[in-house]
Amino acid sequence: MDNIDKTMKFDYEEIPKDNVETVLNNVHRTLEERGYNAVNQIVGYLLSGDPAYIPRQNDARNQIRHIDRDVIMEELVSNYLKENKK
């Protein structure tokens, strides 16, 4: 049986949710301290993968680069849906 006929499972190393939260809070705070629109900058980073959207101040750029963007997006969507469940 060819590998093309098999279903692939997406699996990634589990990153503690509190770590993602801590990093995003630090990035958000840092962006606001620098006078940027934090949401726009984070979205720019998530869509493009370009770390230039995140400042180096407070080690924010280094921290966010250590978390896969898919993991960050998953966490953001999950939290949004929990908070806005009707």
From Swiss-Prot:
InterPro entries for the chain: IreB (IPR009309)
PANTHER family according to UniProt: UPF0297 PROTEIN YRZL
NCBIfam families: PRK05473.1
Family of the protein in this entry: Belongs to the UPF0297 family.
This protein's name: UPF0297 protein SH1302
Source organism of the structure: Staphylococcus haemolyticus (strain JCSC1435)
